[in-house]
Curated annotation (Swiss-Prot):
This is Succinyl-diaminopimelate desuccinylase. Homodimer. GO terms for biological process: diaminopimelate biosynthetic process; L-arginine biosynthetic process; lysine biosynthetic process via diaminopimelate. Pfam families: M20_dimer (PF07687), Peptidase_M20 (PF01546). The gene is dapE. The active site is at 73, 144 (proton acceptor). CDD domains: M20_DapE_proteobac (cd03891).
């Protein structure tokens, strides 16, 4: 398992589109057992519904515990591929397949790093055996690309009950925009999605006094939402952003006033806000658009997590130093991009993210350079050595 490409190909060959596992965790579990890990499979799901499989693995006993988290589920392949999306082919020096970058390749690199750490020299003979005093844990879910209800957050709850703890955690998401060594994620913005339905009364456009047009209030609400800047950013976060995503009336007739109109928008917010504070902010503007009438609208809010930050320090320094030693580049520390399961882990232990290049993730012909698989494996190995020599 010291070769990341072999394991990455085996994982990519599993069509594990959320919530299907398709054998991916079996492949990973076999590799980890061979390295001395104790593995526990943790299927979770709603009563009577489909269950999602997860894996927790640990090697070692007392002492500091280094955690690694990731996911084996992938988004649907879609169309436009030049190679089979689950063929796991190597083409022009790159592994092509859904999940190669996001993030089966990263998982394979971490397993290869552990194998090299504990099993002796690499092909160049430059790595000496280093069986750490302490432990290594992996938290791998099959529910990250989907609703994320029965994955990492449920495994963390199980860990608390079982007395399993990590001293820190590295999430292997593809954090690098263009090249390996670009970026370490030390936090993420929060996310809040709102669906507002403005209620009115249908009627003929020639007789507006007999109807109540909700589109006019929707227009007012849109203006209120966009009229002010949420903030100007903070030391580690860019400014919060509100983006309209949908206006739906369901009215094909130009001479009919609709009975309702629905607006959807998302706010990606920094650490100056919380889901609770922004929910109140949205509700106040809905009330204002409806002249204080609570019966004039319905509001559904989906809060996937607040902004969080692991301040620059021992964990990010450990990753950056290892990356610079391998690539010659010291990564930028960033909180940009979308959400990840790090939002759940942050309440368990310090967490940071670093993985492969994400330029092609979720796209046709998703790919990762074979050379990057090798380089990331060496970065992860150096991170492990650094941690066990001087735990963060």
């Amino acid at each position: 398992m010291a070769d990341p490409l072999a394991l990455a190909r085996a994982l990519v060959a599993c069509p594990s589109v959320t919530p299907r596992d398709a054998g991916a965790l079996d492949v990973l579990e076999s590799a980890l057992i061979a390295l001395g890990f104790r593995c526990v499979r943790l299927p979770f799901g709603a009563e009577g519904g489909e269950r999602v499989d997860n894996l927790y693995a640990r090697r070692g006993g007392a002492g500091p515990c280094f955690g690694f988290a990731g996911h084996t589920d992938v988004v649907p392949a879609g169309d436009g591929w030049s190679r089979p999306p689950f063929g796991a082919e190597v083409v022009d020096g790159a592994l092509v397949g859904r999940g190669a970058a996001d993030m089966k390749g990263g998982i394979a690199c971490f397993v290869a790093a552990v194998a090299r750490l504990i099993s002796g020299p690499d092909s160049t003979g430059s790595i000496s055996r280093h069986d750490p005093t302490g432990s290594i844990a992996l938290l791998i879910t099959g529910d990250e690309e989907g609703p994320a209800l029965h994955g990492t957050r449920k495994v963390l709850e199980w860990m608390e009950g079982a007395g399993e703890r990590m001293d820190l955690c590295l999430v292997g998401e593809p954090t690098n925009p263009e090249g390996l060594g670009d970026m370490i994620k030390i936090g993420r913005r929060g996310s809040l999605t709102a669906t507002v339905t403005l209620l009115g009364r249908a009627g003929h456009v020639a007789y507006p006094h007999l109807a109540d047009n909700p589109l006019h209030r929707l227009s007012t609400l849109t203006g209120l939402l966009l009229a002010e800047t949420l903030d100007d950013g903070t030391a580690h976060f860019q400014p919060s952003s509100l983006q309209l995503t949908s206006i739906d009336v369901g009215n094909p007739a130009a001479n009919v006033i609709p009975a309702k109109a629905t607006l959807r928008f998302n706010i990606r917010f920094n650490d100056r806000h919380s889901g609770e504070s922004l929910s109140a902010w949205i509700r106040a503007r809905c009330l204002a658009a409806c002249d204080g009438d609570e019966s004039g609208f319905s509001l559904v809010l989906e809060h996937s997590g607040d902004a969080f930050l692991t301040p620059p320090g021992p964990l990010s320094d450990l990753i950056a130093t290892a990356c610079q030693a391998v690539t010659g580049r010291r990564p930028e520390l960033s909180t940009s991009g979308g959400t990840s399961d790090a939002r759940f882990i942050r309440s368990h232990c310090p967490v940071a993210e670093f993985g492969l290049v994400g330029r092609t993730m979720h796209k046709p012909d998703e790919r990762v350079a074979v050379a990057d698989l090798e380089a990331l494996s060496e970065i992860y190995r150096r991170v492990l050595v650094g941690f066990f020599e001087a735990p963060c």
